[in-house]
């Protein structure tokens, strides 16, 4: 059955100001299952304001606390150059931390390493991903992250993000999958089958990007010179590579 075409981008009132995109990050989790490569996707609640009912990678907006966390690892300098952060290490690491934190909060899965220090950042919620990791004696492990691409929500939307998509191998994860208020269903699904799900154009684009590498993380790591930026301009998909 052909999947129904849905538009997950809300429309902005033309009389309102174009909002500036907020920094955001997603974590693409991959694992090999026999000859297939599977990706973890979650279905957003129908009650959410942005992309209700869409299947997405875990992720979300960068919080202020993500900028202030002191950890013992950092992103690879070659990845930092690709993130459009003017080589700002602090911003780059905050994006990476956000992707890991959101994954903990939305799925229960943790990409962490033993921490030598107790993280002392004040969190507003007990279920904050970094707070959960800290209680387990863990901190985000940025060395296990690779970079897939980035995307900017088009100007027609009243809610805009500048999202960076990181990748990691599921073998580095701990924890057990659990659904949340944000992701009401979570599944490991083959890359080819994933495209049959209802998803936003940017999610499908990133999955197609993964398929060009057969989901091979090491191949993606070697192709840092050709990473995409996805957006829309004048009603058409606009993709640049750098």
Predicted feature descriptions by range:
Residues 1-242:
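N-terminal leader/linker segments that precede catalytic domains of diphosphate-processing enzymes
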